[in-house]
Each structure stands twice: as C-alpha cells, then as structure tokens.
Amino acid sequence: MALVASGSAQANQTISNAALSERVQTSDEWIRTRTGIQSRRVSTPDESLNDLAIRAGQQALAMAQWEPDSLDLVLLATSTPDDLFGSAPRVQAGLKAQNAVAFDLTAACSGFLFALVTAAQYPVSYTHLTLPTILRV
C-alpha cells in the first residue's frame, strides 16, 4: 500500500493574532509563546469546507493522473462539516466521482490517521475493490 498523490487547499482569508485579540481577551504574545501560531486561515462567507475539499481532491486526482469515475471511495475526515448530515457526498458530486461510496469520518485531531486506516481496510471488507483503486481517495 502506498500514498501516490495528495492535494491541499486553504481558505483565502488570513486572521492575525493581533486581529484575533480585538475579538477575544488575548494578545499576539500570549498566543505566539504558547502555540507558535502567528495567523490562521478562515473561510470567507463564499467558501465552504466542500469547496476546499473539492479543490484538494482535484489536485490529488491530477497528480495521480486518475479520472474521477475511477474512484471507489471518497472519505472525508473533518470535525467541521458544512452540515450535520455530512459533506462527503457533496465532495463526491463536486469531484464527479459517481462510482464512489462517500462518507464522513469525524475524529478531531486523529481524523487523518483514522481515515487512512479506514481506507486501507476498505478493500479487505469489500473484496470486489482493488487496493490501488481504493487508495485513489
């Protein structure tokens, strides 16, 4: 098993510690010394998790040189879905991965690890899938 491609996307807006300290009782120095964080990305009203996930997925597909309809699984690991019913099916539709099963996995900071393990185990449970195909997620 191997990871053969990846994609990433980030929100367009940046908020500095100084701007954050105007909203909550803190300071740039307090945040920076305890976390090392200087700024963070936040979605604008016209950006959603789905948009970011679709962009990242498109990058991964391009890097791997795979067509979206070759995907068997779209697994979205997030603690911030766009709605309570999950975002993976919308990402699947946005990627045009009509042959893929799509579901969300919510596991906070360990979400990536759980998603990786789940994706690796998926072809074991569903033997009609091939391992290279499932890793196209």
Question: Model-found features: residue ranges?
Answer:
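Conserved "HGTGT" condensation-loop signature of ketosynthase/thiolase-family condensing enzymes
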Residues: 1-73, 95
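Conserved catalytic cysteine-centered active-site region
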Residues: 32-51, 78-126
